[in-house]
Design a protein with these regions (language model features):
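Conserved donor-binding/catalytic core segment of Leloir-type glycosyltransferases
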Residues: 265, 303, 314-340, 349, ...
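Donor nucleotide-sugar binding/catalytic pocket of nucleotide-sugar-dependent glycosyltransferases
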Residues: 28-31, 49-52, 225-226, 235, ...
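Nucleotide-activated donor-binding/catalytic signature segment of Leloir-type glycosyltransferases, i.e.
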Residues: 315-318, 352, 360-386
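N-terminal strand-loop element at the rim of the active site
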Residues: 27-178, 270-276, 285
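A charged, aromatic-enriched C-terminal amphipathic alpha-helix characteristic of glycosyltransferases
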Residues: 449, 463-496
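Acidic donor-binding loop of glycosyltransferase active sites
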Residues: 375, 391-408, 423
């Protein structure tokens, strides 16, 4: 099983690896080490290995060159700018201490103001340091302007992209997004050494790694079955890098290697239909929802579940809205903060992946400006087997995501986590989620980014939460929204691709398997 991240924080991948191992498959999950050293641990009966990966190809050649013509005084893009900036800061800090020491010595000696050669020398150095700081700052600004002019989004870059796409077709990714080779060079040799019977490639980057391993194995007379697990509709993704080549490069890479997949799985029916049409797949991808693992027993089942209300300093009756997941502008979290002045007495808990990120700090600052900072609570993730019980302490689950193509076509992880916590929902009007909430009656829908409509929806839910919670009593609703149900779909895909696999002595799913995992994992992306 292949994934392009550090595994921790990716609940879908963790659940897939663990449930496949519980079903009797011999699972090795390869991820990317966040530091330069390899790491390994057990995830239930699955083995996790994190591989160190260098990224020299993620930087383009122009990023190593100086802009001699446009910005001749800019620092070279070698990292020396940060070194010089820090050096000047250290120098000025030292001068401040020397000034304080001379001032104290003069006062203790009864001389009043300091003087003499040491003081004159210090004053001269301070002037020199000030001039140096301005010079370093100027060269830094020149470097920033040079980089801004090299973001690969100008007319020349669009022409370059069009040229290679016309010349090489889907093979153009080798020119447009060469950083994909960094993944191949790190993961490929490890996959070859493992000699798997089946590769489960998560998302678009790992599709190429898996396909190339399959091609090499076929040349040696071995068959590898390849499963592509598509988490997103790539043409609708907001580019992860700030250049015009990233998206067409990755789309071309995906198109080149999709034909090598023996089966495709994905996260929603809408995305399954899109993928079948986009890639002319012979069959509709199997749908494996991002549902929570409600029956999973942790390695330490006695570990206490944090109390979300206690962490917020709230009693049992205070209205508490919760958002759990990634903190980013396209997730629409600003609407929660803007609404707080219009929701007297209500509190908001943001359970996010990076509580101290610049985006989250901006939300806190805005809450302070609105004089509602005491009602905004920022909390870190909890282990994924505690998520549902943790969230159940809130009163309303909020999903305020904005209109992006991938948001329209799937029920995201937090939707299912809120549902199993039996929380009434307030969700934005992205298509699939809004249709589901209206059909089940488990919450209210508001217009994305519309603060007034959000306040209306929250007010309606808080007025009669029992009405919305009653939706979860529908027979079979929550049972279908579990990872245990989804794992059976995945197991059927594996079994179909490997019909000659020996009988699998399944590990009982209810039994905790030895697990040694670094501290915390995601609440839900």
């Amino acid at each position: 099983m292949l994934v392009d991240n550090g595994v921790i924080g990716d609940s879908r991948v963790q659940k897939a690896a663990r449930s496949a191992a519980d079903a009797g498959w011999d699972v090795v999950l390869l991820g990317r080490a966040p530091v330069g050293q390899p790491q390994s641990w057990r995830l239930g009966a699955a083995e996790v290995r994190l591989i160190p990966m260098a990224e020299p190809l993620s930087r383009r050649r122009h990023e190593f060159r100086r802009a001699w013509l446009r910005h001749p005084l800019a620092y070279p893009p070698s990292g020396v700018a940060a070194h010089r900036t820090q050096t000047v800061r250290a120098w000025r800090a030292d001068l401040a201490v020397r000034r304080a020491a001379l001032t104290t010595a003069a006062r203790d000696a009864g001389a009043g103001r300091p003087g003499g050669l040491p003081w004159a020398t210090l004053r001269a150095e301070e002037k020199l340091a000030g001039l140096t700081r301005r010079w370093v700052g100027f060269r830094n600004r020149q470097l920033t302007r040079a980089r801004k002019g090299r973001k690969l989004d100008g007319p020349w870059d669009r022409a370059y992209t069009a040229f290679w796409r016309r010349l090489r077709g889907d093979g153009a990714w080798r020119r447009l997004e060469p950083g994909l080779w960094d993944y191949e060079l790190a993961y490929g040799p490890v996959v070859d050494e493992l000699a798997p019977d089946l590769i489960h490639a998560n998302d678009f980057r790992m599709l190429g790694v898996g396909a190339r391993a399959k091609i090499r194995a076929a040349a040696r007379g071995r068959r590898i079955a390849l499963v592509w697990d598509a988490h997103e509709y790539l043409p609708g993704v907001q580019p992860w890098r700030d250049n015009a080549r990233w998206l067409p490069g990755n789309v071309a890479h995906e198109r080149e290697y999709v034909p090598y997949a023996d089966a495709t799985t994905t996260v929603s029916g809408g995305l399954a239909d899109l993928l079948r049409e986009e890639h002319r797949l012979a069959e509709r991808p199997a749908v494996v929802l991002n549902a929570p693992a409600v029956d999973e027993v942790p390695a330490d089942p006695t570990g206490p579940v944090p109390d979300i209300r206690a962490l917020c300093g709230l009693g049992p009756d205070a209205p508490l809205l919760v958002y759990s997941g990634v903190a980013a502008a396209k997730r629409g979290l600003g609407v929660l903060v803007e609404a707080l002045p219009r929701l007297p007495g209500a509190h908001v808990a943001l359970v996010v992946n990076k509580p101290t990120s610049a985006y989250v700090r901006g939300l806190v600052t805005r809450a302070e400006e609105l004089d509602v900072a005491d009602r905004l609570h920022v909390l870190p993730y909890v282990p994924h087997h505690q998520v549902v019980r943790f969230l159940a302490g809130a009163q309303v689950g909020v999903i305020p995501i904005q209109h992006w193509p991938n948001h329209e076509i799937a029920l995201i992880t937090k939707f299912f986590e809120y549902s199993h916590a039996r929380l009434p929902l307030v969700v934005s009007d992205v298509r699939t989620m809004a249709e589901t909430v209206r059909e089940t009656g488990q919450g209210e829908v508001f217009r994305a980014e519309d603060v007034a409509d959000f306040v209306r929806a929250v007010t309606a839910v808080l007025a009669d939460p029992a009405r919305y919670r009653a939706a979860y009593d529908r027979p079979g609703l929550l049972a279908d929204w579990t990872w245990e149900a989804q794992a059976r779909v995945l197991d059927d895909v594996y079994a179909r691709l490997l019909p000659d696999a020996p009988p699998r002595p399944a590990t009982p799913a209810s039994a905790p398997a030895p697990t040694a995992v670094p501290a915390s994992v995601e609440v839900g992306a």
